[in-house]
């Protein structure tokens, strides 16, 4: 029996794809690059925003332009991450039911830590015990570090914890 459930955020609890696409395309268009379709962005997500921007930018982009574009994306996305993002149908009810049954929940994402915490607080305040996002001092999923951090935060044990996600990266986690 599971007493703890840790969820991925993007594509699992929240539909963030339109805001991610808008953020990437804002950065690309400001630099005169071709913008990307929502389907292209869907294929690029899962390994964190650094990988997302690396894939979205032209292949020959030098490291200086990449670093500036990544910083611009982080600023833009953090300021606009709730414009079109919505929880999937039934997510709030699921989290409410898990809480009522005494099952602890948390969120783990490769998205930057500041945005993860802001989204979790805005959409799921009181429904999850916390959120862990990507940070420079920890490897991203599929490395287990963020999930293990969430488990420590919740006082959870491996054999009674379920991790739920939507991507190959989540499967490898």
Model-derived regions: residue spans:
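Metal-dependent phosphoesterase signature
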Residues: 54-93, 101
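Substrate-recognition "cap/lid" segment bordering the active-site pocket of phosphatases
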Residues: 83-86, 112-173
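Active-site neighborhood of HAD-like aspartate-dependent phosphohydrolases
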Residues: 1-43, 54-57
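Helix-loop "lid/cap" segments that line or gate small-molecule binding pockets
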Residues: 27-28, 48-62, 119, 150-151
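Conserved SAM-binding loop
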Residues: 6, 13, 87, 105-108, ...
């Amino acid at each position: 029996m599971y007493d703890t459930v840790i969820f991925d955020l993007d594509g699992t609890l929240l539909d963030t794809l339109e805001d991610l696409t808008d953020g990437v395309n804002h950065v690309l268009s400001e630099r005169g690059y071709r913008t990307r379709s929502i389907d292209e962005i869907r294929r690029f997500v899962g390994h964190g925003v650094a990988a997302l921007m690396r894939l979205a930018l032209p292949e020959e982009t030098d490291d200086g332009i990449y670093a500036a574009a990544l910083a611009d994306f982080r600023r833009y996305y953090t300021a606009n991450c709730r414009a079109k993002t919505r929880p999937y149908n039934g997510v709030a009810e699921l989290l409410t039911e898990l809480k009522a049954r005494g099952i602890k929940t948390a969120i783990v994402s490769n998205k930057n830590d500041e945005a993860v915490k802001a989204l979790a607080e805005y959409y799921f305040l009181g429904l999850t015990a916390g959120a862990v996002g990507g940070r420079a001092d920890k490897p991203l999923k599929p490395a287990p570090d963020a999930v293990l951090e969430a488990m420590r935060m919740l006082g959870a044990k491996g054999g009674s914890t379920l991790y739920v996600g939507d991507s190959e990266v989540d499967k490898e986690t």
